[in-house]
Amino acid sequence: MSLQDILSVVPAGSPEEALARQVNFAGLPAHIAVIMDGNGRWAAQRHLPRVEGHRAGIESVREVVEGSARLGIGVLTLYAFSVENWKRPITEVSTLMTLLKRYLRLELNTLLRNDIRFKVIGRADELAPDVRGELQMAEDKTAQNRGMQFNIALNYGGRAEIVEAARRAMSSGINPADLDEQRFSDFLYTAGQPDPDLLIRT
């Protein structure tokens, strides 16, 4: 993606054009990771229900995904729902899952149009069947895309990933003496992808 590519799709004289002209396209990160946090605080500051904060967060996801794809970012990972999030009220968790399903239904065509490949990282097998179905459909339909890799971390925990990676390594029959950082990375959810260059917590 070049400056001219960006300028061809943003309105002349717009804030987007001004911002694009400030970007160093030669120094863009290969992998951006975003920890989605603060939706509740955003809503509280505006005296709105927490659900409105989550809805606003979904809108931000749309902008981040499309913007990253237009910039030519190779990998975008959104940490959306951690294993600790199950401790939230049942109604809030249900709302989050409903918003996730709605996003996937509404944005699948956008992912396809922008050649974005979708992948879930985390313990997706522990999610509700209807949620797993939507996630699987999005993965299947975008599997042949060759543009940006879009990972969404659901029911994810860093320690849980390390434990699962260790189990997969042991199951593979690898000699412990041969296991180094590079070989271990082959058992992570993001195997074959570059490590994040930029981590943003919202």
Regions found by a protein language model. Give the residues of each.
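Flexible, compositionally biased loop and terminal segments
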Residues: 1-202
